[in-house]
């Protein structure tokens, strides 16, 4: 009997503004749909200025069969500091939370504890800062926020904004490790692995990829990254 698998993806939408400088949320949704993922973690899903309305409208996402998890704030935002999460039917929310992050500009992370084919899975969506020092502080703040929660398999997903191999980040996340995914930035000629997954104990990646098909190369300055995950043991939390 085949072990259950789950496909998760991360995508920096660049506020649904493509390299052609056109804001086209329908095009962004076309890219998201092509990932064939059950969970999609988004960055820059809202516009920049307060009250930060959604760049990817709720109703458009829901019309495509997505459930938008409740991270939005008053004013119509899809997410928290631009971080949002979409799930397909069959994935249900058990608990969620916001995580404030330190830095030169307002940033935050989101947490969702989800019932999935793998059992209970904790997914943290993040978009770390451009300055290395603050990236490390932000990741440390995320790990502190998770420390007192009941244990379950954990995935950190998002734009880590780190052009290197992530060794310093891995020292902060302790028992987690970065899955070996391909470069995703910049979209026309990707050379940097900014968009990644960090997996906790009990999880492994069976396959991964970067969506290269059009319109992904023009819909954002990032390409979306996906990973197929499975449990390393028969136990599920």
Model region roles, listed by residue range:
Residues 1-39, 51, 67-237:
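Active-site regions of metal-assisted phosphoester/phosphodiester hydrolases
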Residues 57-64:
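Glycosyltransferases and closely related glycan-assembly transferases
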